[in-house]
Amino acid sequence: MSVLDENVPIFKYFEEISKIPHGSFHEEKIADYVESFAKEHNFKYVRDDMNNVIIYKNATPGYENHDTVMLQAHMDMVCEKNKDVDFDFETDALNLYVEDGWLKAKGTTLGADDGFGVSYMLAILSDDTLKHPNLECVFTVQEEVGLLGSINLKKEYFNAKKMIGLDGGGEVSTCTTTSGGRYAYVDKTCA
């Protein structure tokens, strides 16, 4: 039984991916799902050795000469559970429920970071009524453990000069734009 309104594409896709284990370093099954989605919709796509998936959608008529836009979200989630919960993030589906208007997962993290970003892209890709330029939808892996998927992407996969990063943030937002990530390491000798 569905917890969310399946008539709303983003909710439908979020609920579907919540059934697929997708912790960091274990994104194969969700990458399979995204690849199957691309095949089902006859989109050109690339899946690399790390399981990053890039789906390409052609511009709608009248938008062919606009700059290509990249949308990006990561497929892995933070895997945390309550101490009293028996749950295996490599095999078990999340158990979603709504309480007082809030979507939650029983005894575990929800996976909204970045499951909603992934769901947004799938909803955008599946909607043939949206007007848009060429799209490069980038589904990365291993973001939660150091942006490893995005660091290893090959530049020849992309033509976009504009990017919108889709990642959750804050108590009431479901989608924010981000400017990418960067790590800085500092060594300091202490006396």
Per-segment meaning from a language model:
Residues 41, 56-58, 124, 149-152:
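A generic local structural motif
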Residues 63-134, 139, 144, 151-161:
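Active-site metal-coordination/substrate-binding segment of hydrolases
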Residues 20, 24, 104-113, 173-174:
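Flexible, glycine/proline-enriched loop segments at strand-loop-helix junctions
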Residues 1-2, 14, 18, 39, ...:
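Generic preference for well-ordered secondary structure
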Residues 35-39, 51, 118-121, 144-148, ...:
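Short amphipathic alpha-helical surface micro-motifs
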Residues 2-101:
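Acidic/His- and Gly-rich active-site-bordering loop/insert found
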Residues 45, 61, 127, 176-178:
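Generic marker of residues within folded, mature protein domains
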Residues 55, 132-191:
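Histidine/acidic-residue-rich, glycine-tolerant segments that coordinate divalent metal ions
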